[in-house]
């Protein structure tokens, strides 16, 4: 783009996210002038860029690298074969020095993109699907999301109050209340249970009645969440077994 040797896809981020990314600084023509890998919060003020009025209103003043690069082909050959023949990481080894030697431009992406490289961002990205009109909208027919099709029965829900909840196919839900949560395929939640701000990854299979009885005799809970539980701010892994009368209140205080 713009006669550049290298184009880097960037996305505006805020104060909280910036220390987790490689941050680029761009001039008025969007050419990148400097780069820092995962800057400390104390020096963030030195790394702001003009991200546009809307992004700045949202407090997103920093250009984070998305790890997507477009190279002039001949330059790429030179970089890999001659200048950095033993390099193994574009972001850490090749890009910082290339910014000083070549024309490197920022392509600012303003659509939906999020890094889910840590537990908090992974949790936030999934819970955001429960918003009325989420940034990543699964119901946008012009941007269809395709997944592996499964021949599962429809979900069964009984006696449950649902508020801002996304329910995948094949679920068996008998909980008292579920709010601001995402329930993966084949999720099972027992009577009297409350689930708040949780992501349930679901299950790979259904247990048969025979399997349930055999496991109960050994003191092994059924797959899913049992009865009279209270689960909040949690990520429940696939095929997880949570027995009856369990209370889990997750969050930052557990770190």
Name the predicted role of every residue range:
Residues 1, 5, 80-83:
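Conserved, well-structured beta-alpha core segment at the onset of a catalytic domain
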Residues 2-69:
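Conserved core of the sugar-phosphate nucleotidyltransferase
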Residues 41-44, 79, 125:
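Active-site-proximal flexible loops/turns
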Residues 53-55, 74, 81-255:
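Left-handed beta-helix
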Residues 66-78:
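Conserved nucleotide-sugar donor-binding
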